[in-house]
Amino acid sequence: MTAWLDFPLALSPLVVVSMKGGSFGQGSEANGSPQLTGLSECGADRIFLQGQAGIPGIPGVPGTNGLPGAKGDLGPQGPPGERGSTGIPGKAGPKGDKGDQGEACSLASCQQQEAGAKDCKELLDRGETLTGWYMIYPTTGRGMRAYCDMETDGGGWLVFQRRLDGSVDFYRDWEAYKKGFGRQVSEFWLGNDKIHLLTSSGIQQLRIDVEDFNNSKTFAK
């Protein structure tokens, strides 16, 4: 009987035993062969023996990083963010061009002006009850447009300053305050010259109305 055995026990936990032209059985300590356990027959001439697991080997060297992937598609647009706080008012724009000269006053129109109301209170007494801009004549022949409040505190108040939303820049020089500036539909300053004309025509009463960001209102006069 010719037989040969291969025991790669030091390299792999799987031991393959091959036989040719004979049979193979369990060895014994008497004949000097180690006792084999876990034998199973597979086929006509091969027996597989499962040995104990070996010691784990040393980890291999890490491989190189792969190339960067392709750029992904843009994601969907996110929801709009919250509105930020109101910024600081910008600087005043350049001075506008001088307007065209008005027409001379005719005799009929001058007489009508002389008969005009001298202030908002007189307009209210004449039956004007809507708040808005009116033409008044504090002195004879000198008219001006003024905003009359016909609702607050009995009505008849002439508004010479109104600030609501910061849409008009109030950081201006003396010349601007002298002539007046702003927008009739929002914020404005009537003008120092016009205020002087109003206050010099008689005794006036001043009323100041204020409102905070919580819509709380108060006044003083």
From Swiss-Prot:
<dbReference type="Pfam" id="PF00147">
    <property type="entry name" value="Fibrinogen_C"/>
</dbReference>
<comment type="function">
    <text>Initiates complement activation and/or interferes in platelet aggregation and/or blood coagulation.</text>
</comment>
<dbReference type="GO" id="GO:0001867">
    <property type="term" value="P:complement activation, lectin pathway"/>
</dbReference>
<dbReference type="InterPro" id="IPR008160">
    <property type="entry name" value="Collagen"/>
</dbReference>
<keyword id="KW-0732">Signal</keyword>
<keyword id="KW-0800">Toxin</keyword>
<feature type="disulfide bond">
    <location>
        <begin position="120"/>
        <end position="148"/>
    </location>
</feature>
<keyword id="KW-1199">Hemostasis impairing toxin</keyword>
<dbReference type="InterPro" id="IPR036056">
    <property type="entry name" value="Fibrinogen-like_C"/>
</dbReference>
<protein>
    <recommendedName>
        <fullName>Veficolin-1</fullName>
    </recommendedName>
</protein>
<dbReference type="InterPro" id="IPR014716">
    <property type="entry name" value="Fibrinogen_a/b/g_C_1"/>
</dbReference>
<dbReference type="GO" id="GO:0003823">
    <property type="term" value="F:antigen binding"/>
</dbReference>
<feature type="domain" description="Collagen-like">
    <location>
        <begin position="50"/>
        <end position="104"/>
    </location>
</feature>
<feature type="region of interest" description="Disordered">
    <location>
        <begin position="54"/>
        <end position="104"/>
    </location>
</feature>
<dbReference type="GO" id="GO:0097367">
    <property type="term" value="F:carbohydrate derivative binding"/>
</dbReference>
<keyword id="KW-0964">Secreted</keyword>
<dbReference type="InterPro" id="IPR002181">
    <property type="entry name" value="Fibrinogen_a/b/g_C_dom"/>
</dbReference>
<dbReference type="GO" id="GO:0005102">
    <property type="term" value="F:signaling receptor binding"/>
</dbReference>
<dbReference type="GO" id="GO:0005615">
    <property type="term" value="C:extracellular space"/>
</dbReference>
<comment type="similarity">
    <text>Belongs to the ficolin lectin family. Veficolin subfamily.</text>
</comment>
<dbReference type="Pfam" id="PF01391">
    <property type="entry name" value="Collagen"/>
</dbReference>
<feature type="domain" description="Fibrinogen C-terminal">
    <location>
        <begin position="111"/>
        <end position="221"/>
    </location>
</feature>
<keyword id="KW-1216">Complement system impairing toxin</keyword>
<dbReference type="GO" id="GO:0090729">
    <property type="term" value="F:toxin activity"/>
</dbReference>
<keyword id="KW-1015">Disulfide bond</keyword>
<dbReference type="InterPro" id="IPR050373">
    <property type="entry name" value="Fibrinogen_C-term_domain"/>
</dbReference>
<feature type="signal peptide">
    <location>
        <begin position="1"/>
        <end position="25"/>
    </location>
</feature>
